[in-house]
């Protein structure tokens, strides 16, 4: 049942790609009275990736942060270096995800029960897609969340 994704890698400036992804959502966030802050702290974050798929993955994370903001979005998108690795992070201060749901969010078609948030559209494919794309590029995805406090999703790539 698993369709193979076509991956066409080229050298990409990840800071620039993440900046472009964030720009796609700037107007939406501003119109909602929120903030979308970008911090690019990773130097020389050049990587061989499929730019279309990786851009879609980052856009998906930002889109989720907006959808589950529970009001005015307050989002931080960043790149960072740590020992031996680069990170791409998307942090929100929204409704958060319960411990139980956190175990399932990367499964295909799983959608977090959102209580009274009936306006959240989607098919439950987003984080499953993000995880697949990141893993196809040799990276990993980590999610940390606290109910009613917000969610942080980090993509990590080991330095090449």
Give, region by region, the residue ranges found by the protein language model:
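Short conserved segment of the HATPase_c
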Residues: 97-109
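Short beta-strand/loop element within the Bergerat-fold HATPase_c
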Residues: 72-84
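Conserved glycine-rich
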Residues: 34, 138-139
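Conserved catalytic submotifs in the C-terminal HATPase_c
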Residues: 8-13, 30, 35-45
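Short alpha-helical Gxxx[C/S/T] motif in the catalytic ATP-binding
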Residues: 126, 130
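Conserved micro-motifs of the catalytic ATP-binding
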Residues: 2-7, 46-49
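Short helix-loop "hinge" at the ATP-lid/N-box region of the Bergerat-fold HATPase_c
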Residues: 65-66
């Amino acid at each position: 049942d698993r369709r193979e994704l076509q991956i066409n890698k080229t050298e990409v400036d990840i800071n620039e790609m993440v900046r472009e992804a964030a720009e796609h959502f700037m107007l939406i966030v501003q119109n909602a009275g929120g903030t979308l802050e970008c911090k690019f702290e990773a130097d020389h974050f050049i990587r061989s990736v499929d730019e279309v798929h990786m851009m879609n993955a980052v856009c998906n994370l930002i889109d989720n942060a907006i959808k589950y903001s529970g009001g005015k979005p307050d989002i931080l998108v960043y790149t960072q270096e740590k020992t031996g690795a680069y990170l791409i992070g998307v942090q929100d201060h929204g409704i958060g995800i319960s411990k139980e749901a956190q175990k399932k969010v990367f499964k295909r078609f799983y959608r977090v029960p959102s209580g009274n948030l009936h306006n959240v559209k989607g098919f439950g494919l987003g984080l499953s897609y993000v995880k697949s794309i990141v893993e196809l590029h040799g990276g990993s995805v980590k999610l940390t969340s606290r109910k009613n406090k917000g969610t942080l999703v980090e993509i990590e790539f080991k330095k090449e």
